């Protein structure tokens, strides 16, 4: 299961644009934790934490335990608003997690045994359709990742949702089909270019001279 990462934050007493601007002037990023049928919790974050998570990637599916002086909250980072000119974080939205209340989250797919894949050894090309799968699951059972075994796949074979390992209690948001995760495509064959029509029709240099001499009477 995925692990919660702890981040420190400060409590904010009030909401509003003026208060948010004051928070930014103080060198902090205003944020809110909402959901789980509770009142929103107003907090302020160190901008370096937000920038670090943005650079790491995958922050929308990472699990956080937010610690403030008033307590702790488990949450997903759902949105980061950036300044239109500086690209510095201006506001962060977190979704509060509650045990027993399913959440929608994207889980990354790890592809295994690519080097020993039957199809890859024959020159096939791995075509990844989904690097991550959006699922619904309990916050306490969110998988860290799914695994796709490429070892037995030949050319034109594919991996579907039902082939993934580590899905556990996660349910995909796509429910109408056993959707494709990746496929081993045939190798690309580059055909030799045909000679241009004019070049094909042009006679050899020697033949052209012979024809010219033979034409004189």
From Swiss-Prot:
GO terms, molecular function: 5S rRNA binding; structural constituent of ribosome
UniProt keyword annotation of Ribonucleoprotein present: yes
InterPro entries the UniProt entry points to: Rbsml_bL25/Gln-tRNA_synth_N, Ribosomal_bL25/Gln-tRNA_synth, Ribosomal_bL25_b-dom, Ribosomal_bL25_C, Ribosomal_bL25_long, Ribosomal_L25_dom, Ribosomal_uL5_bac-type
Gene Ontology cellular-component terms listed: cytosolic large ribosomal subunit
Region ranges (Disordered): 195-217
Biased composition (Low complexity): 195-211
Coiled-coil blocks: none
Disulfide links within the chain: none
Any GO BP annotation: translation
Keywords from the named record: Ribonucleoprotein, Ribosomal protein, RNA-binding, rRNA-binding
A Pfam family annotated for this UniProt entry: Ribosomal_L25p
Task of the protein: This is one of the proteins that binds to the 5S RNA in the ribosome where it forms part of the central protuberance.
Subunit field text: Part of the 50S ribosomal subunit; part of the 5S rRNA/L5/L18/L25 subcomplex. Contacts the 5S rRNA. Binds to the 5S rRNA independently of L5 and L18.
Protein name: Large ribosomal subunit protein bL25
Lineage: Bacteria, Pseudomonadati, Pseudomonadota, Alphaproteobacteria, Acetobacterales
Gene that specifies this protein: rplY
